[in-house]
Amino acid sequence: MATIKVDVVSAEEQIFSGQAKFVALPGEAGELGILPGHTPLITRIRPGAVRIEAENGEEEFVFVAGGILEVQPGAVTVLADTAIRGKDLDEAKAEDARKRAEEALQNTGSNLEYATAQAELAYATAQLAAIQRLRKLRGQH
């Protein structure tokens, strides 16, 4: 079966590099599915889960907080603002961050504080959704 080279990198480190049969991720206009030979594309990525079906059939999950996606017929590059391996996601921390952001929204004094709290809430909510999606795909409840 045909494969495509996939690289997921953040400012801190390379998160994934390898051959894959399929990649799914949250694009700016909705969920994107990428197969080998995909038409070239550059788009922004929304916070959420990147699912990579590796060459050996195993699935890799990476949470991204946004970034840029570049697709070429033989390569996919995800340049993430922040990226966390699925196995390293901490549900308790994400839930705590969500609660703090919701409280901050209630107690903001300026537009800047409100915008910051909104961004933090969106990040935590996307992280929790990625954790739930990962758990569902792995058959855990």
Swiss-Prot record:
Belongs to the ATPase epsilon chain family. One of its GO terms (cellular component) is proton-transporting ATP synthase complex. This is ATP synthase epsilon chain 1. SUPFAM superfamilies: Epsilon subunit of F1F0-ATP synthase C-terminal domain, Epsilon subunit of F1F0-ATP synthase N-terminal domain. PANTHER family: ATP SYNTHASE DELTA/EPSILON CHAIN, ATP SYNTHASE EPSILON CHAIN, CHLOROPLASTIC. GO terms for molecular function: ATP binding; proton-transporting ATP synthase activity, rotational mechanism. Its main location: membrane. F-type ATPases have 2 components, CF(1) - the catalytic core - and CF(0) - the membrane proton channel. CF(1) has five subunits: alpha(3), beta(3), gamma(1), delta(1), epsilon(1). CF(0) has three main subunits: a, b and c. The lineage of its organism: Bacteria, Pseudomonadati, Pseudomonadota, Betaproteobacteria, Burkholderiales. It comes from the Bacteria. Keywords: ATP synthesis, Cell inner membrane, Cell membrane, CF(1), Hydrogen ion transport, Ion transport, Membrane, Transport. It is found in: Cell inner membrane. It holds the Pfam family ATP-synt_DE. Gene3D superfamilies: ATP synthase delta/epsilon subunit, C-terminal domain, F0F1 ATP synthase delta/epsilon subunit, N-terminal. InterPro entries: ATP_F1_dsu/esu_C_sf, ATP_synth_F1_dsu/esu, ATP_synth_F1_dsu/esu_N, ATP_synth_F1_esu_C, ATPsynth_dsu/esu_N. Disulfide bonds: none annotated. Produces ATP from ADP in the presence of a proton gradient across the membrane. It is a peripheral membrane protein.
